[in-house]
Amino acid sequence: MEDFIHLHVHTYYSILDGQSPVQKLVDKAVANGMRGMAITDHGNMFGVKELFNYCNKINGKLKDEGKEPFKPIFGCEMYVAHRRKCDREKERGDMGGYHLIVLAKNYNGYKNLIKLVSRAWVDGYYMRPRTDREDLERYHEDLIVCSACIAGEVPAKILKGDMQGAREAIEWYKRVFGDDYYLELQRHEVKDPHQRANRETFPLQQRANKELIELSKEYGIKLVCTNDCHFVDQDNAEAHDHLLCLATGKDLDDPNRMLYSKQEWFKTREEMNDIFADVPEALSNTLEILDKVEFYSIDHAPIMPFFPIPAEFGSEEETRKRITPEELFREFTTDENGNEIMSHEEAEKKIKKLGGLDKLY
Protein backbone atom coordinates (compact mmCIF):
# COMPACT_ATOMS: atom_id res chain seq x y z
CA MET A 1 0.00 0.00 0.00
CA GLU A 2 1.20 3.49 -0.88
CA ASP A 3 1.26 6.07 1.86
CA PHE A 4 -1.12 9.00 1.42
CA ILE A 5 -2.36 12.23 3.01
CA HIS A 6 -5.26 14.51 2.10
CA LEU A 7 -4.40 17.79 0.35
CA HIS A 8 -7.89 18.98 -0.69
CA VAL A 9 -10.10 19.30 2.40
CA HIS A 10 -13.04 21.55 3.22
CA THR A 11 -13.89 22.11 6.87
CA TYR A 12 -17.00 23.75 8.27
CA TYR A 13 -15.25 27.04 7.47
CA SER A 14 -16.23 26.47 3.83
CA ILE A 15 -19.51 28.07 4.79
CA LEU A 16 -22.67 26.06 3.93
CA ASP A 17 -20.54 23.69 1.83
CA GLY A 18 -18.05 21.94 4.09
CA GLN A 19 -19.42 20.08 7.09
CA SER A 20 -16.26 18.74 8.76
CA PRO A 21 -15.14 19.87 12.23
CA VAL A 22 -11.38 20.44 12.19
CA GLN A 23 -10.76 18.31 15.27
CA LYS A 24 -12.65 15.31 13.89
CA LEU A 25 -10.64 15.46 10.66
CA VAL A 26 -7.35 15.48 12.55
CA ASP A 27 -8.48 12.69 14.86
CA LYS A 28 -9.46 10.50 11.90
CA ALA A 29 -6.21 11.23 10.06
CA VAL A 30 -4.09 10.40 13.11
CA ALA A 31 -6.08 7.23 13.84
CA ASN A 32 -5.54 6.11 10.24
CA GLY A 33 -1.79 6.62 10.44
CA MET A 34 -1.59 9.69 8.22
CA ARG A 35 1.45 11.88 8.85
CA GLY A 36 -0.34 15.16 8.18
CA MET A 37 -3.13 16.84 6.25
CA ALA A 38 -4.05 20.12 4.59
CA ILE A 39 -7.15 22.23 4.94
CA THR A 40 -8.19 24.16 1.85
CA ASP A 41 -11.41 26.02 2.50
CA HIS A 42 -13.12 27.95 -0.26
CA GLY A 43 -11.56 31.41 -0.55
CA ASN A 44 -10.66 31.74 3.13
CA MET A 45 -8.21 30.69 5.84
CA PHE A 46 -10.60 30.85 8.79
CA GLY A 47 -9.64 27.39 10.01
CA VAL A 48 -5.85 27.60 10.11
CA LYS A 49 -5.56 28.71 13.75
CA GLU A 50 -7.91 25.99 14.95
CA LEU A 51 -5.91 23.43 12.95
CA PHE A 52 -2.62 24.78 14.32
CA ASN A 53 -3.80 24.77 17.93
CA TYR A 54 -5.32 21.31 17.78
CA CYS A 55 -2.30 19.79 16.05
CA ASN A 56 -0.09 21.26 18.79
CA LYS A 57 -2.32 19.58 21.38
CA ILE A 58 -2.27 16.26 19.53
CA ASN A 59 1.48 16.44 18.98
CA GLY A 60 2.05 16.79 22.70
CA LYS A 61 0.31 13.45 23.20
CA LEU A 62 2.13 11.84 20.25
CA LYS A 63 5.47 12.98 21.67
CA ASP A 64 4.65 11.38 25.01
CA GLU A 65 3.92 8.15 23.14
CA GLY A 66 7.22 8.35 21.25
CA LYS A 67 5.49 8.90 17.90
CA GLU A 68 6.23 11.30 15.04
CA PRO A 69 4.35 14.62 15.12
CA PHE A 70 1.34 15.24 12.90
CA LYS A 71 2.01 18.00 10.38
CA PRO A 72 -0.66 20.60 9.52
CA ILE A 73 -0.58 22.16 6.05
CA PHE A 74 -2.21 25.57 5.75
CA GLY A 75 -3.90 26.12 2.42
CA CYS A 76 -6.84 27.54 0.51
CA GLU A 77 -8.89 26.60 -2.52
CA MET A 78 -8.71 29.91 -4.32
CA TYR A 79 -10.71 31.28 -7.23
CA VAL A 80 -8.55 32.49 -10.12
CA ALA A 81 -10.21 35.15 -12.27
CA HIS A 82 -10.76 34.17 -15.89
CA ARG A 83 -9.16 37.48 -16.86
CA ARG A 84 -8.02 39.92 -14.15
CA LYS A 85 -9.33 40.19 -10.62
CA CYS A 86 -10.37 43.79 -11.26
CA ASP A 87 -12.65 42.78 -14.17
CA ARG A 88 -16.32 42.72 -13.23
CA GLU A 89 -18.45 41.97 -16.29
CA LYS A 90 -21.00 39.22 -15.69
CA GLU A 91 -21.58 38.63 -19.40
CA ARG A 92 -17.87 37.98 -19.89
CA GLY A 93 -17.74 35.31 -17.20
CA ASP A 94 -16.05 37.33 -14.46
CA MET A 95 -18.26 36.00 -11.66
CA GLY A 96 -16.38 33.26 -9.83
CA GLY A 97 -13.23 31.83 -11.37
CA TYR A 98 -11.12 28.72 -11.86
CA HIS A 99 -10.40 26.70 -8.73
CA LEU A 100 -6.80 26.30 -7.55
CA ILE A 101 -5.36 24.55 -4.49
CA VAL A 102 -2.66 26.71 -2.86
CA LEU A 103 -0.54 25.36 0.03
CA ALA A 104 2.07 27.13 2.16
CA LYS A 105 5.48 25.43 2.47
CA ASN A 106 6.76 27.58 5.34
CA TYR A 107 6.11 30.82 7.20
CA ASN A 108 7.09 32.96 4.21
CA GLY A 109 4.67 30.98 2.04
CA TYR A 110 2.02 31.38 4.73
CA LYS A 111 2.44 35.17 4.60
CA ASN A 112 2.23 35.10 0.80
CA LEU A 113 -0.93 33.01 0.98
CA ILE A 114 -2.44 35.47 3.44
CA LYS A 115 -1.59 38.28 1.03
CA LEU A 116 -3.20 36.46 -1.90
CA VAL A 117 -6.38 35.69 0.02
CA SER A 118 -6.66 39.20 1.47
CA ARG A 119 -6.20 40.84 -1.92
CA ALA A 120 -8.76 38.45 -3.41
CA TRP A 121 -11.35 39.72 -0.93
CA VAL A 122 -10.38 43.39 -0.94
CA ASP A 123 -9.56 43.92 -4.62
CA GLY A 124 -10.96 40.89 -6.45
CA TYR A 125 -14.37 40.20 -4.96
CA TYR A 126 -17.09 39.69 -7.56
CA MET A 127 -19.50 36.94 -6.48
CA ARG A 128 -16.38 35.19 -5.16
CA PRO A 129 -13.04 36.42 -3.75
CA ARG A 130 -10.77 36.12 -6.81
CA THR A 131 -7.06 36.21 -7.32
CA ASP A 132 -5.38 36.37 -10.73
CA ARG A 133 -2.18 35.39 -12.49
CA GLU A 134 -0.55 38.72 -11.76
CA ASP A 135 -0.92 38.25 -8.00
CA LEU A 136 -0.03 34.56 -8.15
CA GLU A 137 3.24 35.40 -9.86
CA ARG A 138 3.92 38.29 -7.50
CA TYR A 139 3.39 36.20 -4.34
CA HIS A 140 4.41 32.75 -5.62
CA GLU A 141 7.41 32.17 -3.37
CA ASP A 142 7.21 29.15 -1.04
CA LEU A 143 3.78 28.11 -2.29
CA ILE A 144 2.71 24.75 -3.71
CA VAL A 145 -0.21 24.67 -6.14
CA CYS A 146 -2.37 21.82 -7.44
CA SER A 147 -4.66 22.03 -10.46
CA ALA A 148 -7.78 21.30 -8.35
CA CYS A 149 -11.06 19.65 -9.32
CA ILE A 150 -12.72 19.75 -12.75
CA ALA A 151 -13.49 23.42 -12.03
CA GLY A 152 -9.75 24.12 -12.17
CA GLU A 153 -8.38 25.89 -15.23
CA VAL A 154 -6.55 22.93 -16.78
CA PRO A 155 -9.27 20.26 -16.38
CA ALA A 156 -12.01 22.76 -17.30
CA LYS A 157 -10.25 23.58 -20.57
CA ILE A 158 -9.64 19.88 -21.24
CA LEU A 159 -13.37 19.18 -20.88
CA LYS A 160 -14.17 22.05 -23.25
CA GLY A 161 -11.84 20.54 -25.83
CA ASP A 162 -9.46 23.47 -25.52
CA MET A 163 -6.21 21.52 -25.31
CA GLN A 164 -4.21 24.52 -26.49
CA GLY A 165 -5.60 26.54 -23.59
CA ALA A 166 -4.91 23.68 -21.16
CA ARG A 167 -1.30 23.49 -22.34
CA GLU A 168 -0.88 27.25 -22.08
CA ALA A 169 -2.12 27.15 -18.47
CA ILE A 170 0.18 24.25 -17.59
CA GLU A 171 3.17 26.03 -19.11
CA TRP A 172 2.39 29.22 -17.19
CA TYR A 173 2.01 27.47 -13.83
CA LYS A 174 5.12 25.37 -14.42
CA ARG A 175 7.12 28.50 -15.28
CA VAL A 176 5.96 30.33 -12.15
CA PHE A 177 5.90 27.48 -9.60
CA GLY A 178 8.37 25.01 -11.11
CA ASP A 179 8.43 21.65 -9.30
CA ASP A 180 5.87 22.97 -6.80
CA TYR A 181 3.11 22.64 -9.42
CA TYR A 182 1.14 19.38 -9.46
CA LEU A 183 -1.65 18.01 -11.63
CA GLU A 184 -4.55 16.74 -9.53
CA LEU A 185 -6.68 13.63 -10.08
CA GLN A 186 -10.10 12.98 -8.52
CA ARG A 187 -12.51 10.05 -8.82
CA HIS A 188 -15.98 10.30 -7.25
CA GLU A 189 -17.69 7.17 -8.55
CA VAL A 190 -21.18 6.43 -7.24
CA LYS A 191 -21.48 2.65 -6.94
CA ASP A 192 -24.81 2.34 -5.12
CA PRO A 193 -27.50 2.24 -7.84
CA HIS A 194 -30.21 3.26 -5.37
CA GLN A 195 -28.45 6.32 -3.96
CA ARG A 196 -29.65 9.73 -5.08
CA ALA A 197 -26.40 11.41 -6.01
CA ASN A 198 -24.56 13.25 -8.76
CA ARG A 199 -23.49 10.67 -11.36
CA GLU A 200 -22.43 13.15 -14.01
CA THR A 201 -19.21 14.26 -12.32
CA PHE A 202 -17.33 10.94 -12.38
CA PRO A 203 -17.33 10.50 -16.21
CA LEU A 204 -16.09 14.08 -16.54
CA GLN A 205 -13.37 13.41 -13.99
CA GLN A 206 -12.29 10.32 -15.91
CA ARG A 207 -12.12 12.26 -19.18
CA ALA A 208 -10.03 14.96 -17.54
CA ASN A 209 -7.85 12.42 -15.70
CA LYS A 210 -6.93 10.61 -18.91
CA GLU A 211 -5.57 13.81 -20.43
CA LEU A 212 -3.97 14.98 -17.17
CA ILE A 213 -1.98 11.75 -16.94
CA GLU A 214 -0.72 12.20 -20.50
CA LEU A 215 0.07 15.87 -19.93
CA SER A 216 2.01 14.98 -16.79
CA LYS A 217 4.25 12.73 -18.89
CA GLU A 218 4.57 15.33 -21.65
CA TYR A 219 5.60 18.15 -19.32
CA GLY A 220 7.30 16.17 -16.57
CA ILE A 221 4.81 17.38 -13.96
CA LYS A 222 3.98 15.08 -11.07
CA LEU A 223 0.49 13.82 -10.29
CA VAL A 224 -1.34 13.87 -6.96
CA CYS A 225 -4.72 12.37 -6.11
CA THR A 226 -7.24 14.02 -3.82
CA ASN A 227 -10.83 13.42 -2.75
CA ASP A 228 -12.32 16.94 -2.42
CA CYS A 229 -13.40 16.15 1.15
CA HIS A 230 -16.49 17.94 2.46
CA PHE A 231 -17.54 15.71 5.37
CA VAL A 232 -15.79 13.33 7.74
CA ASP A 233 -17.41 9.90 7.30
CA GLN A 234 -19.47 8.18 4.64
CA ASP A 235 -22.45 8.17 7.01
CA ASN A 236 -22.43 11.99 6.97
CA ALA A 237 -23.39 12.18 3.27
CA GLU A 238 -27.12 12.65 3.85
CA ALA A 239 -26.58 15.33 6.49
CA HIS A 240 -24.27 17.11 4.06
CA ASP A 241 -27.01 16.88 1.43
CA HIS A 242 -29.33 18.73 3.82
CA LEU A 243 -26.65 21.40 4.25
CA LEU A 244 -26.55 21.91 0.48
CA CYS A 245 -30.31 22.46 0.48
CA LEU A 246 -29.86 25.20 3.06
CA ALA A 247 -27.08 26.73 0.99
CA THR A 248 -29.09 26.75 -2.24
CA GLY A 249 -32.55 27.39 -0.80
CA LYS A 250 -33.96 24.18 -2.28
CA ASP A 251 -36.21 21.43 -0.94
CA LEU A 252 -34.83 17.92 -0.53
CA ASP A 253 -37.36 16.54 -3.02
CA ASP A 254 -36.60 19.16 -5.68
CA PRO A 255 -35.71 17.07 -8.77
CA ASN A 256 -33.56 19.85 -10.22
CA ARG A 257 -31.49 20.79 -7.19
CA MET A 258 -27.73 20.54 -6.94
CA LEU A 259 -26.36 17.18 -5.85
CA TYR A 260 -22.92 16.02 -4.80
CA SER A 261 -21.67 12.53 -5.58
CA LYS A 262 -21.77 11.71 -1.83
CA GLN A 263 -18.25 10.33 -2.23
CA GLU A 264 -16.68 13.42 -0.66
CA TRP A 265 -15.90 11.98 2.75
CA PHE A 266 -12.44 12.04 4.37
CA LYS A 267 -11.35 8.66 3.04
CA THR A 268 -8.77 6.44 4.68
CA ARG A 269 -5.42 5.60 3.13
CA GLU A 270 -6.82 2.16 2.29
CA GLU A 271 -9.85 3.60 0.51
CA MET A 272 -7.70 6.01 -1.50
CA ASN A 273 -5.35 3.16 -2.47
CA ASP A 274 -8.31 1.15 -3.77
CA ILE A 275 -9.47 4.08 -5.90
CA PHE A 276 -6.05 5.03 -7.32
CA ALA A 277 -4.32 1.63 -7.44
CA ASP A 278 -3.45 2.19 -11.12
CA VAL A 279 -1.58 5.46 -10.42
CA PRO A 280 0.40 4.72 -7.24
CA GLU A 281 2.70 7.69 -7.83
CA ALA A 282 -0.29 10.03 -7.39
CA LEU A 283 -0.70 8.60 -3.89
CA SER A 284 2.97 8.72 -2.89
CA ASN A 285 3.43 12.23 -4.27
CA THR A 286 1.12 13.53 -1.56
CA LEU A 287 3.91 12.57 0.86
CA GLU A 288 6.44 14.43 -1.30
CA ILE A 289 4.36 17.56 -0.77
CA LEU A 290 4.14 16.85 2.96
CA ASP A 291 7.93 16.58 3.15
CA LYS A 292 8.29 19.94 1.40
CA VAL A 293 6.22 21.61 4.10
CA GLU A 294 7.99 22.78 7.26
CA PHE A 295 6.75 22.80 10.82
CA TYR A 296 6.32 26.47 11.73
CA SER A 297 4.38 28.60 14.14
CA ILE A 298 1.65 31.02 13.13
CA ASP A 299 1.31 32.42 16.65
CA HIS A 300 1.83 36.17 16.90
CA ALA A 301 1.64 38.76 19.61
CA PRO A 302 -1.36 41.13 19.36
CA ILE A 303 -0.79 43.81 16.74
CA MET A 304 -1.86 47.13 18.22
CA PRO A 305 -2.12 50.44 16.35
CA PHE A 306 0.49 53.08 17.17
CA PHE A 307 -0.80 56.37 18.54
CA PRO A 308 1.80 59.14 18.96
CA ILE A 309 1.60 60.83 22.37
CA PRO A 310 2.57 64.53 22.67
CA ALA A 311 5.62 65.09 24.86
CA GLU A 312 3.64 67.14 27.37
CA PHE A 313 1.43 64.10 28.04
CA GLY A 314 4.39 62.11 29.43
CA SER A 315 4.87 58.36 29.05
CA GLU A 316 2.13 55.96 27.92
CA GLU A 317 1.60 54.81 31.49
CA GLU A 318 1.39 58.38 32.77
CA THR A 319 -1.07 59.21 30.01
CA ARG A 320 -3.30 56.25 30.88
CA LYS A 321 -3.37 57.26 34.54
CA ARG A 322 -3.98 60.90 33.73
CA ILE A 323 -6.63 60.76 31.06
CA THR A 324 -10.18 59.50 31.43
CA PRO A 325 -12.59 60.20 28.55
CA GLU A 326 -13.95 63.23 30.41
CA GLU A 327 -10.47 64.56 31.14
CA LEU A 328 -9.46 63.99 27.53
CA PHE A 329 -12.29 66.17 26.27
CA ARG A 330 -11.52 68.85 28.85
CA GLU A 331 -7.90 68.78 27.69
CA PHE A 332 -8.98 69.79 24.21
CA THR A 333 -12.09 71.87 24.82
CA THR A 334 -11.06 74.21 27.67
CA ASP A 335 -8.22 76.59 28.45
CA GLU A 336 -6.14 76.61 31.63
CA ASN A 337 -8.93 78.53 33.39
CA GLY A 338 -11.60 76.00 32.47
CA ASN A 339 -13.23 78.21 29.82
CA GLU A 340 -14.61 76.38 26.78
CA ILE A 341 -12.55 77.06 23.68
CA MET A 342 -13.71 74.26 21.41
CA SER A 343 -16.99 72.46 20.74
CA HIS A 344 -17.46 68.77 21.43
CA GLU A 345 -17.51 68.02 17.68
CA GLU A 346 -14.31 69.98 17.07
CA ALA A 347 -12.62 68.13 19.93
CA GLU A 348 -13.57 64.76 18.46
CA LYS A 349 -12.07 65.74 15.10
CA LYS A 350 -8.84 66.87 16.75
CA ILE A 351 -8.53 63.66 18.79
CA LYS A 352 -9.10 61.52 15.70
CA LYS A 353 -6.44 63.45 13.83
CA LEU A 354 -4.02 63.13 16.73
CA GLY A 355 -4.56 59.38 16.79
CA GLY A 356 -4.19 59.04 13.02
CA LEU A 357 -7.82 57.98 12.73
CA ASP A 358 -9.13 60.92 10.74
CA LYS A 359 -9.01 58.94 7.48
CA LEU A 360 -11.10 56.15 8.97
CA TYR A 361 -14.10 58.32 9.83
Provide a role label for each language-model segment.
Residues 1-361:
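Phosphodiester-processing cores and adjacent nucleic acid-binding clamps
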